[in-house]
């Protein structure tokens, strides 16, 4: 499991450097177990640009960087370990609004956003798809 998360962080670095195949990056995200902070009975997310972003982290160090600025202070951050595929295939469609996945958002030069488009989320909820999500452009 840890190896899979490390592989995703490596693919993100390669992509940010201009290399790697974007499809391979999406595949690695889908196979990776991400740590997603839990708050108020749900997964921690932010809204930006008309999109709700579920925040996931590749390891506890990346989650800790996030918690320094957004955590509950003196309490540990609770999180769920979720497969990337489950996030984009099940959780995103259940939100009922344009939503994507933001990975390692507190890591300088190491974050990656997986937007609500065909090939990342199901076509029915993708903002560029032909389903119900097509009318919900951000």
Report the location of each language-model feature.
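An interfacial alpha-helical scaffold signature
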Residues: 1-138
């Amino acid at each position: 499991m840890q190896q899979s998360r490390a592989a995703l962080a490596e693919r993100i670095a390669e992509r940010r450097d201009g290399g790697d195949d974007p499809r391979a990056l999406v595949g690695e995200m889908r196979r990776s177990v991400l740590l997603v902070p839990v708050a108020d009975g749900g997964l921690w997310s932010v809204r930006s640009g008309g999109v709700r972003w579920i925040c996931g982290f590749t390891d506890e160090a990346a989650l800790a960087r996030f918690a320094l600025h957004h955590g509950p202070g003196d309490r540990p951050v609770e999180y769920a370990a979720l497969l990337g595929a489950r996030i984009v295939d099940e959780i995103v469609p259940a939100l009922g609004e344009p939503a994507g996945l933001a990975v390692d958002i507190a890591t300088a030069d190491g974050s990656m956003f997986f937007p609500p488009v065909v090939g990342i989320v199901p076509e029915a909820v993708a903002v560029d798809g032909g389903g119900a999500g097509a009318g919900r452009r951000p």
